[in-house]
């Protein structure tokens, strides 16, 4: 499918979706705790439903009531588990792999064609070092894991994905010995690790930080039943803010901001550096944009999901926008650096692709084009917002938004966007 996107202005109120990362983590931890654990204000999307289905395969009894998930009975580690298909969700397969290593019987985990291109080897090596038997297809899914891991000393690289570390942390308290975790190389996406630890603490597990982002100790413990409220998703909020900056007129973004750590909240600072005035209330955000953005140099090493919403702001920037230290964005659902470079140049802006980022510079010759999002949800949304600014665009793969923001097109059209399926 494709969507036709015409030049358009948005105004009014729009509600930001709940946080995908916290929804994943809270569902897994509620499923490990059971006993009526409840996750409120969840994001119900294709990715998070993959986590729900994985937990059910592990034996958890889960009910969905409106925007809440209730876990009556926890994961059963003596269960024979059928193959788990995590669809397109990298978070699901990585955390589920850690949990699978707590079972004695072999468990197979797989995903769709895109997921089968994403690396797993660093996590598999770490699990193997503490007693798991792991098989894969050249370090990628499908994978087979046989436990049971006993715990102990584990070393894992931090420069691929923080999801590997999150998987080890979540499984650690349920091992016989606990885990002493050492992270080598520079850790990317640090705030996502903070999110994992914050969620674990909400479910009663203590994580001892020996050296931040380098060494952690998790002793044998149990997860306790809890109620967890998911905050808004700053990754999705960044896209809505970009839409308001480029195309907004009195646009108000509503949602439960909360006080849990989110790496992508740095987008507020980025907007202010670009010259945007941002007013944050208890449950809403308003912005006021200058006629032209300032441009600047931005390090996205800890927030790779901000690459799509930041790149499109170059359309209305008087100076170049340079994005650095985000090489790991090439390992997302797609190679977001390469695809962004390839597609945005069609709109008439100048793009220099570097190994770890991009330099983007607007021109006076912006023009509509067909933009191929390669079935990447964040690229689809970013390209639609760009199309609203430039006009006369076509964007491929609208179905991709099911993984993070299923109502994106409908909600944007409700406040004035002109995005029509073809």
From Swiss-Prot:
Phosphoenolpyruvate binds at residues 20, 90, 118, 163, 336, 378. The active site is at residue 305. The lineage of its organism: Archaea, Nitrososphaerota, Nitrososphaeria, Nitrosopumilales, Nitrosopumilaceae. Belongs to the EPSP synthase family. This is 3-phosphoshikimate 1-carboxyvinyltransferase. Pfam families: EPSP_synthase. GO terms for molecular function: 3-phosphoshikimate 1-carboxyvinyltransferase activity. The keyword Cytoplasm applies. The gene is aroA. Catalyzes the transfer of the enolpyruvyl moiety of phosphoenolpyruvate (PEP) to the 5-hydroxyl of shikimate-3-phosphate (S3P) to produce enolpyruvyl shikimate-3-phosphate and inorganic phosphate. Its EC number is 2.5.1.19. It is found in: Cytoplasm. 3-phosphoshikimate binds at residues 20-21, 25, 161-163, 189, 305, 332. One of its GO terms (cellular component) is cytoplasm. Gene3D superfamilies: Enolpyruvate transferase domain. It comes from Nitrosopumilus maritimus (strain SCM1). It catalyses: 3-phosphoshikimate + phosphoenolpyruvate = 5-O-(1-carboxyvinyl)-3-phosphoshikimate + phosphate.
């Amino acid at each position: 499918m494709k969507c036709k996107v015409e030049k358009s202005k948005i105004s009014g109120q729009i509600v930001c979706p709940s946080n995908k990362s916290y929804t994943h983590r809270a569902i897994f931890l509620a499923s490990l705790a059971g006993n009526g654990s409840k996750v409120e204000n969840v994001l119900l999307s294709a990715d998070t439903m993959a986590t729900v289905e994985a937990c059910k395969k592990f034996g958890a009894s889960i009910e969905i009531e409106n925007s809440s998930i209730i876990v009556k009975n926890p994961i059963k580690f003596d269960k024979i588990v059928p193959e788990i298909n995590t669809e397109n969700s990298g978070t699901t397969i990585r955390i589920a792999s850690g949990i699978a290593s707590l079972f004695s019987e072999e468990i197979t985990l797989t995903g769709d064609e895109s997921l089968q291109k994403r690396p797993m080897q660093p996590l598999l090596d770490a699990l193997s070092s503490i007693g798991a038997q792991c098989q894969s297809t050249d370090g990628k899914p499908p994978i087979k894991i046989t436990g049971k891991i006993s715990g102990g000393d584990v070393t894992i690289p931090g420069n691929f994905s923080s999801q590997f570390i999150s998987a080890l942390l979540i499984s650690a308290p349920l091992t016989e010995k606990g885990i002493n975790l050492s992270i080598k190389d520079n850790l990317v996406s640090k705030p996502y690790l903070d999110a994992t630890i914050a969620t674990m603490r909400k479910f009663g597990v203590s994580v001892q930080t020996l050296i931040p982002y380098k060494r952690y100790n998790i002793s044998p413990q149990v997860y306790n039943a809890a109620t967890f409220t998911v905050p808004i998703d700053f990754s999705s909020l960044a896209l809505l803010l970009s839409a308001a900056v480029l195309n907004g007129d009195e646009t108000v973004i509503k949602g439960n901001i909360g006080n849990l750590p989110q790496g992508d909240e740095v987008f507020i600072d980025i907007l202010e550096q670009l010259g945007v005035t941002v007013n944050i209330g208890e449950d809403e955000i308003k912005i006021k944009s200058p006629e032209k953005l300032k441009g600047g140099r931005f390090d996205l090493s800890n927030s790779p999901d901000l690459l799509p919403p930041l790149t499109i702001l170059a359309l209305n920037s008087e100076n170049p926008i340079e994005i650095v230290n985000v090489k790991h964005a090439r390992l997302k659902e797609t190679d977001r650096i390469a695809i962004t470079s390839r597609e945005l140049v069609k709109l008439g802006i100048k793009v220099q692709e570097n190994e770890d980022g991009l330099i983007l510079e607007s021109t006076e010759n912006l023009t509509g084009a067909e933009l191929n999002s390669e079935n990447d949800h964040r690229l689809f949304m970013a390209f639609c917002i760009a199309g609203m600014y430039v006009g006369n665009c076509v964007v491929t793969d609208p179905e991709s938004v099911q993984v993070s923001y299923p109502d994106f097109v409908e909600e944007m059209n409700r406040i004035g966007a002109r995005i029509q399926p073809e």
